[in-house]
């Protein structure tokens, strides 16, 4: 699984766990709904650390908490 897929999966999981809709997350994090949906649908290759930071704020978690998951232990890095 690629990093962008893992990001999408983690956001979906945290929204479900916290009973928060994507719309609510978009509002709370000040990330436009279209941007959030591009991340969730994996059409954004690299959402950027600041966007992930804002999403974490919307979820009331730290970036460390976001990435502190089994799914991020074996990320495949792409060379550009």
Q: What are the language-model segments listed below?
A:
Residues 19-38:
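Short alpha-helical DNA-recognition segment
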Residues 15, 26, 56:
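The alpha-helix within a helix-turn-helix
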Residues 1-20:
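A short, Lys/Arg-rich alpha-helix, primarily the initiator
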Residues 13, 38, 67-80:
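Short, charged recognition helix plus adjacent turn
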Residues 43-54:
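Short, basic-rich loop-to-helix N-cap that marks the start of a DNA-contacting helix
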Residues 15, 40, 51:
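DNA major-groove recognition helix of helix-turn-helix
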Residues 32, 43, 70-74:
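The DNA-recognition helices of helix-turn-helix-type DNA-binding domains
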Residues 12, 23, 53:
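Residues within the helices of the helix-turn-helix
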């Amino acid at each position: 699984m690629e990093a962008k897929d893992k990001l999408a999966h983690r956001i979906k999981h945290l929204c479900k766990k916290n009973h928060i809709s994507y719309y609510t997350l978009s509002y709370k994090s000040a990330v436009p709904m279209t941007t959030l949906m591009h991340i969730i649908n994996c059409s954004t290759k690299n959402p950027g650390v600041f966007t992930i930071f804002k999403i974490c704020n919307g979820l009331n978690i730290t970036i460390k908490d976001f990435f502190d998951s089994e799914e991020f232990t074996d990320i495949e890095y792409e060379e550009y």
